[in-house]
Amino acid sequence: MPVAPRKNKKEHADVDVRGGLRRPTLPPYRAARLAVIVALSAFVIVASRPVATAPAPVAGYQQFLSPASPLEVVAARKADRIAWVAFEEGKRNAYTAAAPAFTPVRLTAFIKDDGIDMSDVKISDDGSTVVFVRGTAPNRDGWIANPTADPNGPERAVWAARTTGGPAFRVAEGANPELAPDGSSVLFTKDGQIYRAKVTPLKPAAEMDRGEKPFIREWGTQSTPRWSPDGKKIAFVSTRTDHSFVVVYDMATRMVKYMSPSVDFDTNPMWADGGKSVVFLRHPGLPFAQQAQQGTGTIGLPNGPGFQANTTGRGRGGAGAAGATGAANAQPPRIADVPGLQRATFKGGYTLSVMKADVGSGDAREVWHNQPNDPIATTLANARLAGDYVVFPLVVGGGRGGRGAPGTADDAPPPPAGPVDEWDRYYSLNLSSADSRPVLLTTTDGLIEDQASVEISADEKTFYYCTNAGDIERRHIWAVPVSSGTPHQVTFGKGIDTQPTPLASGNTLATLSADWRMPQSLAVWPLATSASLDRKIVFPASRKGFPLDAHVEPQLILTKAADGMEIHNQLFLPKDIGPGERRPAIVFVHGGPARQMLLGYHYMQFYHWAYGINQWLASQGYVVLSINYRSGIGYGRSFRTAANTGGSGNAEYQDVLAGGKYLQTRPDVDPNRVGIWGLSYGGVLTSQALARNSDLFKAGVDLAGVHLWGSSLDPDAVSFKSSTIGAIDGWKSPVLLVHGDDDRNVAFQQTTGLVQLLRQRDVYYELIVFPDDTHESMLHSRWMYTLGRMETFLKKFLWPHKTMTTDGPRR
């Protein structure tokens, strides 16, 4: 096998800091252009002779990553119109379409690969106005990503467009817009206050109307503003350190009213009864032991006990650590054993209430509360209202439930804990019932990943959700009445359907849809008929140049790790493998680790690209295995929470090693030509493979990987031994490292530190650094450059100079 070229210290690594490019080979576009010129010259010379039909050109990574992809979709509440954000080779734009034709119309004209993100798309109730955010979220230092290093600096701002036509326009600097039902203005929070900006292409005269001066300025920190259905009132949360209020602002009177103010934490306001009521959640306020406010030293304003504990080595500093003024190793103070001093509950011992307030009077009543000492129903995170019902997800243990849960009397003790359910479940709670009991909606066994996976119909009667129930390697849409009932499947087949978005009429469902050779698209499904048979692809309208026929259908392959853990993988086999031929192979490891690769194009942007890259690698002749290692999602809670993973033991690497060994046993794989690639957590496992098993993995591409778990450099620490650097002396194989230095997920120092270790061990590496770029590069051009380098790197170290067969090498 070829040996990595030896270079002196100065030339040991092929380093590329973009902006100071040094590359030994022609860029792909120049190489392609040269090939075209040569081919045309040859054609001129032999044109007078009979020629055979030329074979179809092999598609490159450029073609596999060329189609426009919708990223998120929303629907108007009172019109059959949808809006979405699309990514088109680095250009991010907003689109809209309306029933019945659903012809896509581009609303914006951002025609450059400028690295400016677009997100948070919203549409008014009548579908006339669409708003969205341009710019990334700030990092921990408050810096918005600026991947093009624009000297003017970056901005994050709310933009808008009319679906009837006209250019898009900037509304105000801000994010997370809450669009008024009529589309006339947006709300957003900044510096703990609520701002409003009018949605108009003409610059308003007043600062307040431009979103430059607070619209609602109150004591404390204001958050989660929510318009009433008629747009005449705003509900929001006002947090005051040890308690919080739900507040309603009246647009006509410019007055606020507090909903049943108390000493407790009131959160998550939801409008009910057409705007006459507000439903919210209530948790107990802080007991004395948890109060950490700094006082003035007067009789009525002492420091909170929690503040005192922090300064004496307890609290934020932790026992044995110095606080603001305390000494190291100080003993924590004694706390009186008095009920209610350290832990707060409501009377009866419960810790969560669902409240319903009358907006006119401000009075509220309790609708439901959880059980005393209930470890499950503690927050009702992501609860949403559907008519008279609150719908919410729970992680459920066997036999547990809230007050009035099925089979549980209000005064009965909680039943013994059973095994934890492998899946999150959604429940509904009837607010109109005097003896309300949570009702289980999602009786299907499968993953419901996040809030983008669920939606409620416009008439508030049906709960739609995306799950892998019944088809664990894909995603489909299911539906169930919010009042209770048996869920039914809406989409079928080999597709991957996500982000269910029911339209106002109730006749149509929009989704993001893909399959093993169709990249993510925007689809609409008629709900009155067999949806899967009548699906219509709305966007993109064309995939010209996309190599549809170059795809191979991935196979599900099960492997077993050394400890017996069964792992699901996708295998991509090249179409042109000859009898007895052995090919190079590549392992792909996803990031997260809370991810699951599927038997088709993924719904998340990078993993959508990763699937396309794996298809491209297979089209180039590699046998590709994509591994769904333990601690990922899709296979139940026990798999997701597997023991001894990451910095606690690196157990998931066993799954990667098992995948590599599986490839070595295949008769169509050259066992001496196995590589590996991945980003983020995939970079973690790529580096682990190269450090621990360079005998198996002969080359790797590590994008933004973590190489040291935690911060301990103690060689006996579990985190150190679980890290790549704990096995660094075994690293012999070449690696291509890629990282942006404004990474908000993995510290750039993880690559900085690794390079120092590789240099000292004379390990061949190539390095690409993208200044001012993030975890996943924001620029399409940089992805194209990275893949070009990856192609050259893998060919150099994995593609044999001799073709291996089952009978041995041949020239």
Predicted features along the sequence, with ranges:
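Bacterial N-terminal signal peptides
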Residues: 34-46
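Beta-strand-rich domains and repeat architectures in extracellular enzymes and scaffolds
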Residues: 62-93
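Residue-level detector of Asp-centered blade-edge/turn motifs that repeat once per structural unit
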Residues: 77-78, 125-126, 181-182, 229-230, ...
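Hydrophobic beta-strand positions that form the internal "hydrophobic ladder"
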Residues: 82, 127-130, 186, 231-234, ...
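A flexible loop/linker signature enriched in serine peptidases of the S9 family
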Residues: 85-95, 110-117, 131-159, 167-176, ...
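Short loop/turn segments that connect beta-strands within beta-propeller blades
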Residues: 98-102, 162-166, 199-202, 250-254, ...
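Serine-hydrolase catalytic core recognition
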Residues: 287-289, 325, 347-352, 380-388, ...
